[in-house]
């Protein structure tokens, strides 16, 4: 109530969320205390660097309704994984944020029929690729304006990097010639859209790991992903 009646409009409210994985007693709390100012209004310039595994996901964010209308957000219909677009495309329109250090959302993962289950994601890989390409398009199209806000651009670029990694490792995990070709095509698409962004991503740790040659290289890629799953607690 206090924020709603203030002189500045609150564009995005952020809170913690908890991964609760089926069969595991330990819960993984995703919080932002060392990244965002706590319980006060702030802007992108006030944010610290987002570490790997800490991103603003749908479980942790509430946008101002008018902002979503003004930014023209339109999610693809009959498509899974569009939550990545939901927490990506409105960001250039976000000026004022507030971080509520409370475990507000509990995300239950690990069920076999869940949309983020690895096997299910591989079966819907074309939808994951579609979302990834839309994110590439959006970042490249907005880049000239985004680079003026260094912290915002860095965050959006890093978030696209993790989505590229997820798409790549799922295609590698499938292992079919068709899916390996789709992985190659996805990286070529990024290269065609923005060669500088492609080189930054391709020469990074995650991009390099996802593009190691041969069967042995692909095995290393998957093992690296498994380690990240254990470290960050995601599905």
Q: Whereabouts are the PLM-identified features?
A:
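Amphipathic alpha-helical repeat scaffolds of TPR domains
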Residues: 154-170
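Donor-binding/catalytic cores of nucleotide-activated saccharide
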Residues: 1-98, 105, 109-122
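Short, charged, amphipathic alpha-helical segments
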Residues: 150-158, 180-184
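Gram-positive cell-envelope targeting signals
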Residues: 1, 73, 91-94, 100, ...
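Catalytic core of nucleotide-sugar-dependent glycosyltransferases
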Residues: 102-111, 117-146, 163-166, 173-196
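Inter-helical turn/loop segments and adjacent helix faces that build the functional surface
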Residues: 75, 142-151
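Inter-domain helical "communication" segments and dimerization helices
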Residues: 9, 22-37, 47, 126-130, ...
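Membrane-interface aromatic/basic loop that binds lipid-linked glycans or pyrophosphate carriers
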Residues: 172-235
């Amino acid at each position: 109530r206090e924020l709603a009646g203030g002189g500045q409009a609150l564009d995005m409210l952020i809170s913690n969320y908890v991964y609760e994985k089926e069969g595991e007693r330990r819960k993984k709390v995703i919080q932002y205390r060392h990244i965002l100012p706590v319980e006060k209004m702030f802007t992108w310039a006030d944010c610290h660097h987002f570490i790997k595994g800490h991103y603003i996901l749908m479980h942790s964010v509430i946008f101002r309704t008018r902002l979503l209308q003004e930014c023209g957000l339109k999610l693809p219909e009959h498509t899974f994984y569009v939550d990545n677009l939901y927490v990506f495309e409105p960001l250039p329109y976000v000026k004022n944020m507030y971080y509520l250090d409370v475990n507000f959302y509990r995300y239950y993962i690990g069920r076999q029929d869940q949309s983020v289950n690895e096997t299910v994601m591989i079966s819907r890989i074309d939808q994951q690729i579609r979302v990834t390409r839309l994110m590439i398009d959006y970042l490249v199209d907005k880049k000239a304006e985004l680079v003026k806000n260094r912290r915002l651009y860095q965050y959006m670029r890093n978030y696209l990097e993790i989505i590229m990694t997820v798409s790549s490792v799922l295609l590698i995990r499938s292992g079919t010639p068709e899916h390996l070709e789709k992985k190659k095509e996805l990286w070529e698409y990024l290269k065609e859209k923005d060669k500088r962004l492609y080189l930054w991503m391709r020469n990074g740790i995650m991009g390099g790991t996802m593009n190691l040659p041969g069967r042995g290289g692909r095995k290393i890629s998957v093992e690296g992903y498994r380690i990240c799953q254990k470290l960050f607690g995601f599905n």
